[in-house]
Amino acid sequence: AKCDEGAEKTVVIYWMYDTMPVTQPDVWIAPPFEGRLVEMAPFKKVLVGRGATNSKGPQMAQWNALMSIRAAVGKLPVNLIFVAEGDEERMSIGYRQFVRQHPDLFKGATAMYRFGSQGFSGGGELSGASEGCVYVEITTSGTKWGRGPTVSDIHGGNKRSVDSPAWRHIKMLQTLVSDDGNKILIDGFYDNIEPLSKDEQSKLEAAAKGVDMDIAAKNLGVARFISDDPLTYLKMARYGTSMNLDGIWGGNMYAGGAGAILPNKITSKHNFRYLPKQDGMDITRKLRAHLDKHGYQDVEM
């Protein structure tokens, strides 16, 4: 959608309306797909629903603000192009095609993505950083390894005499990151990362002065951050990289009770966050090379 105000400058506003599936509906205080106003301290009434914060709520607030300015002033100081996609959670495949097919639409334009960043204090935050994301599933199986259970899970008592793909998977994961999980040990991962410009550094330092670490932790629901220094925290949050362990599954997945299983295979899911000069496919190639180098040629990606 376009909003042509006859201005010299044009801003492309990116929106996304898809969400991830609801995996824990029992922890929601209201039906996730209903959209319900509920009382929640310290905000009084809040809207609870899937995508309320990421990102349909902030997008609607942005739209209301822009239309209010337009109604009060007569027109906006810039032209607007709204580009909304429902494919973000699948790596924006359709969006990439759209950009390639309509290069003139984006020529000379500034892009902006408005995320919900209001915290307990009521203040907002303007972020000038960007990131890429790659999801990877890694599987270790006795079938590919040629050791341990090669057809299906077997009784856990057999571990006394049979190798375990599960333990092999855990040992493999230990080669990928430092002991605290905060440094990626894949050769070449940090290649092509450019240092911050003077302008970026000065803006970061200015923003750090307004960061209350206690409020930031409360907003996110964590006890503390990797660093207690506001500037370091902000630099990590905006310009950092990571390899996260999203989840791991295989074998006996039921909590409590008895049940001895020696799994045939274990799978873990990960997401890499990387910076503009890095490349997602290059990162996956380097991950494959790392696994091969450390003797895990049988591990599948």
Residue ranges and their predicted role:
Residues A1-A52, I69-V78, H270:
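Acidic/His- and Gly-rich active-site-bordering loop/insert found
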Residues A1-K2, G157-R160, T267-L275:
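Short, well-ordered beta-strand elements within core beta-sheets of diverse protein domains
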Residues D18, D87, Q118-F120, T143-W145, ...:
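Short, glycine-/Ser/Thr-/acidic-enriched flexible segments
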Residues V27, G74, S127-C133, A237, ...:
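Short glycine/proline-enriched loop/turn "hinge" motifs that connect secondary-structure elements
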Residues F43-E131:
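Acidic/histidine-rich catalytic neighborhood of metal-dependent amide-processing enzymes
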Residues L105, G128-Y135, W145-M253, K277-D298:
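Acidic-enriched catalytic cores of C-N bond-cleaving enzymes acting on peptides and small amides
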Residues V136-S141, N264-F272:
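Oligomerization/assembly interface segments of phage tail-like spikes and tubes
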Residues V162, A255-N264:
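Short, solvent-exposed beta-strand/turn "edge" segments of beta-rich domains on protein surfaces
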